[in-house]
């Protein structure tokens, strides 16, 4: 019934109270006496929309809509929310507390709020509503008991099930305390929401009605509240909707239909939002204030307790399980353990409220169901670990199960068809029934482990369906048979399905929102296969039904009696009438022909083309496979997230990863039009749109994203971290094509719509981090932020992004195109055999032009060609780059090589070695330039110009231009304007023609050099007259000067003259001067002596292979020797070598002599370097030997050995570069000596040795700046002698002896080393061989252990030689048998 009440101010109540306008003596002039109790606004007779009230017309109406539904910028937890009016003027900030979570409020009409998992709070005069829904509305809970307060307009209805979608709100801790809610320190802010009649009020108090009650929700702020009726009621002037100081930044007044709607306050003592009261009355449409009933704490506590049976305690001492019996006729039951019996109450007939709650306690409890139990609205709460089982197949139904934190319950009881087991609580429920459980599961908190056991037929089904909601729970599968994946759904805010290493196939993923998580949290990799594509033969055929209801898009079959044909129709809407009989379409039916197969294919194609959507998240150790049939063009859209360690595979169709548009509350178009007519264009008509600017960022991480025949797009507000493997696929990173769900926020059903949305802010752009591999005509489009490498074969790469950073990239048969406005940085090496096309775009190599480099990070960049088009085309080559490829500039583009960075003076050794690659410059470029209208700048660059080149404007700073051959013997560099400073031009001549520099308009600068390479040696009589440089006549004579350059082994200085002719000034080559460069020759000679140094190393070790052979008893032996040493010589030469030898020999006793004969193998690894070269020699060899020891003390030793050398060296003189070569050498040596014993334990041993060798000659030929250069060393047979003396002392024990020894030797060459012949354009000269000698000294130990094992260790050095051994350590071991 509808009554009219008005709010009047009461001095007693210190607030507004509701008074009937028809009550006697309650006239407008009277405010002294309460004539009527606070009652209702309008009873709730039906369920309609959501919450609301009266708001002012200064603020956009969408603010109040989003506020009430926790959408837009009012998402739970949001802080410091700034509020602006429709004119963009600042109104205030919601900064007293973070935005509360309104999910506990009934999501349809907002007249009730969940305060306990099974109880809601509202007003008792709302007698018409019988159920509530929460979250996205895909649930319904029925009221089984209204629990009306006796003296207050309040009730706390009980629900039939435990709510799983949301958590109940906290309620006020103070309750009904007079004046409590005037305390601004404790309660600084109050928020309300409701679905009452919707009005907008202007500043004149004029109301405009926007909608009736229960149509939609609105919410906002209210001021502090005064109390009356002993604190049971509170009131405030909420109707003053223009008073922001009193009522906050979003004032709202409760209207008719808002009865029961909640009032929330932030409690600073508890530091959380609490439900303070429920709205009971108002002051009429557009009135001054509202009243609320404060939550009666004692009353609700009483009602909660009334629904509980006595707690059940399991006692181990009683023995046995709690035996649970139940009489379904009476609704009474009992749990008996031993002599103790606990009564319980279940459903009585249709009365669910008769069922009471049971609380179980006692450690490791056991319950056995003897009968099936229907507990009605009664729930089970487990405080301790329990096992619930049945021996006779009994079932249980009720409100649900609560498992406390830290508690584990083993549930071995099945449910019944049509009923869901609701589980909440932070503890773990393990479901371990048997066979097929026809009941469903709804879980809202904690963990549920599905471990259903097979029955005697092998059948397993833990539940017929599983719903995971609220964001709190996790469901774990013990195997893949527990539940049909297609019956799993993630409701409001979702939760986690942990597949636990089990691979599953989903034909549908029913995820309501981002909270849905599909995960695998174990080490065993699981594969999730998506198979949502509809096959034509799976399209169901429907027939006409008298209900006249169906699903739009379904296919219907009609046997037409009028035409004797079989007709097929597609339903267009959810209701229908008769089929058309003339094979036509109308508003309800679409006629699709007479062929069943064609009709089914049409339906399947439409379904597949529409695409599929997953709002949720993929996590953990997963592979995901989505392989669609060929020809399917629909998209799989993911606007949730992914973080998986496996591979996501997509074959055919489309795949879109994108951010998620922020969901907003919305109204019908008629409401939006009505508001727009008043100047408010804020109201939205759908939850998301392509035009909205607010999107949520999403992140996707895969180990690998494998694409085959796929159209892949990374949309706005999405970050992708992965390696993409694309085969015949299109990859668009920064795709403007995006999707919205027109059903977003309203459950698991979705309605996909494709459109475009381009991010204008960097924070909203897509981001890619990783590597892209392209193959088989794939296309990569980079439109947004990109950080990664590209490996492409037979594909295309297009860049339109202004923020692309390329890592190591290799493109084979693949073009790179930079489109207008693009700005890309290749920060690491870039190699392409195809063109790089830069169209009004910028490509930077190594670093951007505005960056200053203080570290050396050299990169190599190569392309078939670098092509610039458009006046805004830019190619920037940063410092420390090695560039290769021709540069072509069509228009007035810009090419810059070198940048402005400076090299750090504190380079590491590694960086110093890297810097040596640049030959003293910061940049190296090899290629030709075709840029007749462009501006080209080079700084600290070595340009190897391998073809005729042109530039409009050229600026050179500390740059060397080397003219090299191309298609013609000589090349020309032509520029209109040249500004050159401290630069050099290296030209070539054959005494007839030469390379040439031509400057057409102006030439400026200073300190520039001209170097000339002579390809042909002129005679002393030749007179040259060859123009090298042509410039305007006004050019300064000293702009260029002749400079000496090292070419080959010589210093070459051209002789230049300057002449004016035909308005031009020319620098003419008249001749040259040449002189030998001793430094280059010395470096070459040092390098050519490497083989001699290696020979000396081998000589010094010929006789140290075996250790002491005296007094050996065995007939044969094996030995191993390891030598490590280093040496040095003139010219900064150093080497370090490691030698490994092994051999075997046999002992022959010949009268007065022991003769040892054997074979040996050897390997040596040598690193050598000097001032101008470095490299490595690896040597392999073998030989044989014989050693004779006379009993008199005399001995001899002979050996012959062959060595093969593999040499790899980098030469930094005369342009020799890398030289890899092989060489061979032979050794033959003989040593004699005599051991004189001074005592039994001391001796002295004079020695003499002669070694002959054969070293192969070596010739090297190359070209240095156009000049033929060679160096040659002849073969040589070195002969080396050595004399010296060794003395030692032996220490002996029972089974061992140790001999210490010291030696001094003089080693000398008896023949000269090989001559070295050096040749260049200046002629040939010879560096004669030489003899060398040195003193060697060392100490050593020889040890014998038993009769078979001998160890030796020796340390040696040399001095006074041109080549010396700096240190050598020799160790050997010998075993005789």
UniProtKB/Swiss-Prot annotation:
pH note: Optimum pH is 6.0.
Q: What is its EC number?
A: 3.4.21.-
User: Which keywords belong to this entry?
Assistant: Cell outer membrane, Hydrolase, Membrane, Periplasm, Plasmid, Protease, Secreted, Serine protease, Signal, Transmembrane, Transmembrane beta strand, Virulence, Zymogen
Q: Which InterPro entries match?
A: Autotransporte_beta, Autotransporte_beta_dom_sf, Autotransporter_pectin_lyase_C, Bact_Autotransporter_VF, OM_autotransptr_brl_dom, Pectin_lyase_fold/virulence, Peptidase_S1_PA, Peptidase_S6
Q: What are the record's GO terms for cellular component?
A: cell outer membrane; cell surface; extracellular region; periplasmic space
According to the UniProt entry, its GO molecular function terms are: serine-type endopeptidase activity
Q: Does the keyword Phosphoprotein apply?
A: no
Q: Where is this site: Cleavage?
A: 1100-1101
* Signal peptide annotation: 1-52
Q: Which domain of life is it from?
A: Bacteria
Q: Where does the Peptidase S6 domain start and stop, copy by copy?
A: 53-302
Q: How is it modified after translation?
A: Cleaved to release the mature protein from the outer membrane.
Quote any Pfam family the record assigns. Answer: Autotransporter
Query: What regulates the activity here?
Result: Protease activity is inhibited by 3,4-dichloroisocoumarin.
Taking every annotated instance into account, which residue ranges of this chain make up the domain Autotransporter? 1111-1377
Q: Do the record's keywords include Membrane? A: yes
The UniProt function text for this chain reads: Interacts with hemoglobin, degrades it and subsequently binds the released heme. Could make heme accessible not only for E.coli, but also for B.fragilis during mixed intra-abdominal infections. Has a role in abscess formation.
Question: What the record says about its domains?
Answer: The signal peptide, cleaved at the inner membrane, guides the autotransporter protein to the periplasmic space. Then, insertion of the C-terminal translocator domain in the outer membrane forms a hydrophilic pore for the translocation of the passenger domain to the bacterial cell surface, with subsequent cleavage.
Q: What is this protein called?
A: Hemoglobin-binding protease hbp autotransporter
Q: Which taxonomic lineage does the organism of this UniProt entry have?
A: Bacteria, Pseudomonadati, Pseudomonadota, Gammaproteobacteria, Enterobacterales
Q: Which gene encodes it?
A: hbp
